Amino acid sequence: MSKKIIIIDNSDLSYSGEDIDGTILRGTETSLILLSEQFHKMGFQIDYCNEIKEEKIVNGVRYFNKKNIDKTINYDLAIAVSDANQFARVTSLKKAIFSVSNQPLEKFLRKKQLIPFLKF
């Protein structure tokens, strides 16, 4: 049985691996799509959640809306993009935050991310 990984994007963007050569993706989204596809090649089951309207599978990665995350699924790893508050949406054995920017304490407090960061 393959391990299950979920990636939860905190942005309001709607995208999938089909958009990798388009204009809407930034570096973080592109990096995570490529990482997801590599994980799939290694035998992992990958769910990728953002604001996408319709579920689709692209290059082995299942994309669906983060509002439709099933908390009864126990993932082996949950990766949240920059916001530990996203972990409240999911059940997982391990959690990791993917952030490409510096998070000063002020920003953690302002965006109410400090407690979830320490909690998860």
Where do the model's predicted regions map?
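N-terminal subdomain of nucleotide-sugar transferases
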Residues: M1-C49
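Extended catalytic core of nucleotide-activated donor transferases of GT-like folds
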Residues: N50-F120
